């Protein structure tokens, strides 16, 4: 499952087939093609591009492992990126880690995870009881209701990342600064 939020619309890229095979490779290629096209269109329009994630450590792992896993076996799939292409992207100034910004700007006595920080911005998830572990259970359940809940959860994670980004850009309104404690 890959997901992106462009500021207006959540774009899910999901396969419900067994993982590790052609269906997963095609899904990854669909996501990468959408991302590449979106970035190129922005550049062509004279815009700057920022692709934001919450914790690039995990995202980099999944991007690289997907490229590594599928590059040789499914080279016939259009849009499937090479390891070199993924490495160039994650090393580019367009790939931005919101969590790194959060760690630099905020202190959190209960942590700085997305759910904690996004709630401080006023964001809430439609799927209140879903977290990373529960999302795996939803995927494995495979029912239409579980799939809908998983896509809702992933979409909310994407929108929550945008909410945290806006919150930080606005100066984290409503939160005390370290100067308040000096």
Where are these regions (language model features)?
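Acidic, Mg2+-coordinating catalytic module of metal-dependent nucleases/exonucleases
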Residues: 106, 117-181
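Intrinsically disordered, low-complexity, compositionally biased regions/tails
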Residues: 7, 83, 175-178
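Conserved DEDDh/DEDDy metal-dependent 3′-5′ exonuclease domain
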Residues: 4, 15-136
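Active-site cores of enzymes that catalyze phosphoryl transfer or operate on phosphate-rich substrates
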Residues: 1-13
